[in-house]
Regions:
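Transmembrane alpha-helical segments of multi-pass small-molecule transport proteins
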Residues: 102, 127-148, 165-169, 328-347, ...
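Juxtamembrane transmembrane-helix boundary signature
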Residues: 32, 59-91, 101-111
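Extracellular/periplasmic helix-exit of transmembrane alpha-helices
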Residues: 67-80, 221-222, 230, 250-279
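Loop-to-transmembrane helix boundary motifs in multi-pass membrane proteins
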Residues: 95-98, 133-136, 247, 291-293, ...
């Protein structure tokens, strides 16, 4: 096994370090992982588990498989062309089409940032009793400060630490409950759509497969500029990137599954429907003990902060891409995009009447924009003019088109059920 890993992943430049070389290249995918363990996911997953038990675990699995294919394709674009998805959209699509696509993606990113900031604010209210609106301002300000003063590598280190805190928190929570693992295992692979579940299913999909993450992943990858280093380096990096994506998305799948399972074993089993994350934390205490609600709130705070940072970075990537530029926090187009995103997110937080419903519907909004981004991604990565010899194969194109069709069908189900 080790020899196989060395052969497949070993570096041609260094002579190969096998499995150790793999670990050195894990990082960009974890920036994406943060985006799908954000507070919007918490709201969607808690709603799914508390209302339908284990029944909707399958959508977490399906969404993660779709996410792996899409994120690998977005990273593929960045590695092969040296352009992120936003830059490539501006460069290769008609101007009015490119601006419309990026404009819709930017609005979806503001919706994302609103969910992240709102979730962090709810956590501050749980921990310190701060009003939600004041918490929104604090979370947005801290996130923007972290972005304005951090390089990619520093941001990666922050985020890996934050993901670790969230993951360990849910391991601790699951250790306190009795899980029906055979039922959970069956639900991971058995699709079902209980009555009234359409909006929750689409919100879980939107919470996992998020359009802003496709822009972010391609930007982080392309900033390393492998495209000018020759075919050997590009092909090597494609292998490393695939492992990074599989590992990172696997971590996200486990954490999202843990959220649904926790809600199913605590709330659904006791007939409690979660309509507020703060209420969810309070409801954990009598069932699992007082420490459980504190662990829940701390994990939510770290999830909110870290995902706010990546949402802001994605916003800056999109606005820079509108001008065919790379993301650079010290550049005017990037910094204005970041600042405007947080201002818009805070403004949305201030007018949302019900924070929990705001989280749920923000995720549904993301899934409505997602087909647009997926179509553009497929169009670009299947073009030999854009990708050269690294253009999508026919089987990969068929897979990506199938993913786009699933997303569109679920969106239609949501719209007809509203």
């Amino acid at each position: 096994m080790i020899n196989h890993l060395k052969h497949h992943f070993g570096s041609r430049r260094t002579g190969g370090h096998g499995g150790l070389d793999i670990a050195r290249h894990i990082g960009p995918g974890l920036l994406v992982t943060v985006g799908f363990i954000d507070p919007g996911n918490w709201a969607s997953n808690m709603a799914a588990g508390s209302q339908f038990g284990y029944a909707l675990l399958w959508i977490v699995t399906l969404s993660t498989i779709m996410l792996i294919a899409l994120q690998h394709n977005a990273a593929h674009l960045g590695i092969a062309t040296g352009a992120c998805l936003a830059e490539a959209t501006t460069r290769y699509l008609p101007r009015f089409v490119g601006r419309a696509v990026l404009g819709s993606a930017y609005l979806a990113t503001i919706a994302t940032a609103m969910a992240e900031v709102l979730g962090g604010a709810i956590a501050l209210q749980m921990l310190f009793g701060l009003p939600v609106r004041a918490g929104c301002v604090i979370v947005a300000a801290v996130s923007m400060a972290m972005l304005m003063t951090s390089s990619y590598k520093r941001a990666e280190r922050w985020i890996i630490a934050f993901v670790g805190v969230v993951g360990l928190s849910f391991l601790a929570e699951l250790a306190l409950v009795k899980v029906d693992w055979p039922q959970a295992a069956a639900s991971w692979i058995t699709p079902s759509m209980p009555s009234g579940s359409a909006a929750i299913i689409v919100s879980v999909l939107g919470a996992v497969v998020m359009p802003h993450n496709l822009f972010l992943h391609s930007e982080v990858i392309q900033s390393m500029h492998f495209e000018g280093q020759g075919e050997q380096i590009i092909e090597e990096r494609l292998r490393y990137e695939l492992f990074d994506t599989l590992f990172s998305m696997g971590v996200g799948w486990a954490i999202n599954s843990a959220m649904v399972i926790l809600a199913a074993t605590t709330f659904f089993a006791h007939g409690i429907v979660v309509e507020d994350l703060a209420v969810a934390a309070d409801a954990l205490s009598p069932i699992l003990g007082p420490a459980s609600s504190t662990i829940f709130a701390v994990a939510l705070l770290f999830a909110g902060l870290s995902s706010s940072v990546t949402a802001g970075m994605a916003a800056g990537t999109i606005t820079a891409g509108m001008f065919d530029e790379e993301y650079d926090i010290h550049d005017r187009h990037s910094s204005i995009g970041v600042a405007a995103c947080f201002v818009g997110a805070v403004a949305a937080c201030l007018v949302v009447p019900n924070p929990f419903e705001g989280l749920i519907w923000s995720q549904a909004l993301l899934s409505l924009q997602l087909p647009i981004t997926v179509v553009v991604l497929i169009r670009l990565t299947s073009s030999r003019r854009v990708m050269g010899k690294y253009a999508n194969s026919r089987p990969l194109n068929a897979l990506l088109v199938g993913i786009g069709a699933i997303v569109t069908i679920l969106d239609v189900v949501l719209l007809t059920g509203m």
